[in-house]
């Protein structure tokens, strides 16, 4: 089939049940392995159904039935996911585990106040080679990606040129 598809990990407590994205599910003690294996199975199912491999994008499902620790483990393992055959989408925008960064400091927290943390995750994900990111505040995240690109370019950065696209692996930040 010629239609692009994004396959996201979302394990529920009951097979076939769709509920709240909050909370956690049993990932067999290793969320990274569980997400890898599930996304691989989903991709193989899509290929078997006739979806072309160049139309498949994978998403680890940050925040969907995962604890904050699960989400951080998945972000730390992002390079492992990027070694896979398919492009990776990182959807961390305004997730509770990012808002919790502020709570840990004892300051006001809300999903809206997680935009700076979202921008940081966006810039790091783009720098690592993520195919794309899902964000609410495009300008803030775009600035973060462009700052990281300028930083990496150093003296080669010419200020007036668009910085995106300069990362290894050809990522453009997807914002």
How would you label these PLM feature ranges?
Residues 1-45, 49, 65-162, 167-175:
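Active-site-adjacent loop and "lid" segments of alpha/beta metabolic enzymes
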């Amino acid at each position: 089939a010629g239609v692009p598809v994004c396959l996201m990990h979302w394990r529920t407590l009951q097979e076939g049940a769709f509920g709240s994205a909050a909370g956690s599910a049993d990932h067999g003690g290793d969320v990274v392995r569980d997400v890898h294996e599930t996304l691989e199975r989903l991709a193989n199912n899509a290929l078997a159904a006739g979806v072309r491999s160049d139309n498949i994008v994978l998403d680890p499902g940050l925040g969907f039935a995962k604890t904050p620790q699960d989400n951080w483990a998945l972000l730390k393992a992002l390079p492992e996911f990027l070694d896979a055959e398919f492009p990776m989408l990182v959807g961390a925008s305004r997730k509770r585990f990012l808002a919790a960064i502020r709570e840990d400091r004892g300051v006001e927290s809300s999903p809206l106040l997680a935009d700076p943390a979202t921008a940081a995750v966006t810039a790091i994900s783009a720098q690592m080679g993520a195919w794309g990111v899902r964000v609410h505040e495009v300008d803030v995240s775009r600035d973060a990606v462009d700052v990281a690109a300028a930083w990496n370019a150093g003296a080669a950065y010419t200020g007036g040129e668009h910085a995106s696209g300069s990362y290894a692996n050809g990522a453009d930040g997807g914002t």
